């Protein structure tokens, strides 16, 4: 009997490419759950590159009416020991501060979660997969499905980015090597110093590539015009009616939001240039605390208790020895990727006598050397 393999596919093509090449070398039954927009959906409906025994489209089910059961979510949480509401309250789509296009009610969120939990259980009960193959989970539904597979004892094969150059690795967990202790114990000793490793990491740091990508796209007038033409003329905007992740994203509203964000980004960058330290003065001992880009998976899913970074800075500053300062550096991709933070947040940090805000252009290595 052949193995049964389940894939989570989305707009990022890596998982589909994995399925394509695996199918060439293994006679295995493939199944898939697909989370894409309407435009991309047509490809998965018509493609002949990979034969899937059955395909489910996540948002098709989210649009179906169900007869809700009041205790279903509670029983699901107890059955699998998964805190659904903890995941929901850290979903960027459901957080008003991040999603300015649509405000979800608790009832709507509850209904969405019930539909997806029923779908996920139905798929896993029907397929009974031997393996779940996926890329890194970035959004709540994908992460919930991954957690459910783990709880059901399904072998997870997750392709993780090593955040070290162009390397990746396969693991059963997000950003964790399954056999790290074994690999570490059996490794061959190499004449490598800490500085060697630090320099290698600095040369291959991922944030530099991400920042370059954002800048090349957001600073390109041609690409901005192409995006506006795509939005206003070519797009039918059907996702706004069929995908809850696009609720409220009417064409004009999205265009005005982008214009508004561009203006905000300019003013915020001007404030940063005028008010953040661009040289490290080490006349007093200090602790270095770099901020994380937000909204981002690394906070919302990996460290939800610390998603309010302003509160985290305030808390850490209160724990410092009396003669220490806290040097806080903005993330280099917060501007190009997220239009910087509100100026009021920066001012709140500046009002803390223990805090010094460091310009995002200052290399972290330089700060660490002087800390």
Q: What name fits each language-model region?
A:
Residues 118-182:
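Conserved nucleotide-sugar donor-interacting segment of glycosyltransferase catalytic cores
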Residues 30, 156, 160-163, 326, ...:
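Hydrophobic beta-strand scaffold residues
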Residues 8-26, 305-320:
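Histidine-anchored nucleotide/phosphate-binding helix
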Residues 2-12, 35-36, 105, 133, ...:
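Nucleotide-activated donor-dependent transferases that construct or modify glycoconjugates
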């Amino acid at each position: 009997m052949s193995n049964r393999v389940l894939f989570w596919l989305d707009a990022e093509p890596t998982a589909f490419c994995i399925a394509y090449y695996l199918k060439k070398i293994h006679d295995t039954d493939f199944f898939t759950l697909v989370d894409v927009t309407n435009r991309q959906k047509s490809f998965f409906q018509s493609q002949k590159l990979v034969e899937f025994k059955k395909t489910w489209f996540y948002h098709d089910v989210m649009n179906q009416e169900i007869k809700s059961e009041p205790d279903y979510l509670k029983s699901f949480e107890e059955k699998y020991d998964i805190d659904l509401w903890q995941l929901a309250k850290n979903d960027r789509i459901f957080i008003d501060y991040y999603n300015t296009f649509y405000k979800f009610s608790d009832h709507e969120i509850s209904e969405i979660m019930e539909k997806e939990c029923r779908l996920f259980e139905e798929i896993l009960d029907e397929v009974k997969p031997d393996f779940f193959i996926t890329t890194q989970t970035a959004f709540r539904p994908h992460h919930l499905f991954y957690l459910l597979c783990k709880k059901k004892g399904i072998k997870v094969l997750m392709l993780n980015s090593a955040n070290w150059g162009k390397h990746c690795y396969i693991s059963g967990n997000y950003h964790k090597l399954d056999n790290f202790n074994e690999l570490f114990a059996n490794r061959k000793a190499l004449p490598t110093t800490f500085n060697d490793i630090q320099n290698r990491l600095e040369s291959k740091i991922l944030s530099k590539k991400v920042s370059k990508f954002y800048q090349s796209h957001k600073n390109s007038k041609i690409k901005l015009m192409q995006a506006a033409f795509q939005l206003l003329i070519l797009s039918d905007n059907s996702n706004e009616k069929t995908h809850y992740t696009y609720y409220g994203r009417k064409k004009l509203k999205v265009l005005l939001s982008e214009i508004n964000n561009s203006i905000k980004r300019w003013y915020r960058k001007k404030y940063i240039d005028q008010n953040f330290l661009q040289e490290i003065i080490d006349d007093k001992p200090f602790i270095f605390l770099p901020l994380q880009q937000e909204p981002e998976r690394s906070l919302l899913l990996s460290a939800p208790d610390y998603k309010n970074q302003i509160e985290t800075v305030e808390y850490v500053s209160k724990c410092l020895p009396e003669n220490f300062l806290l040097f806080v550096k903005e993330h280099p991709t917060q501007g190009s990727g997220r239009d910087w933070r509100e100026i009021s947040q920066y001012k709140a940090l500046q009002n803390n006598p223990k805090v010094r805000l460091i310009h995002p252009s200052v290399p972290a290595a330089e700060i660490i050397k002087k800390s």
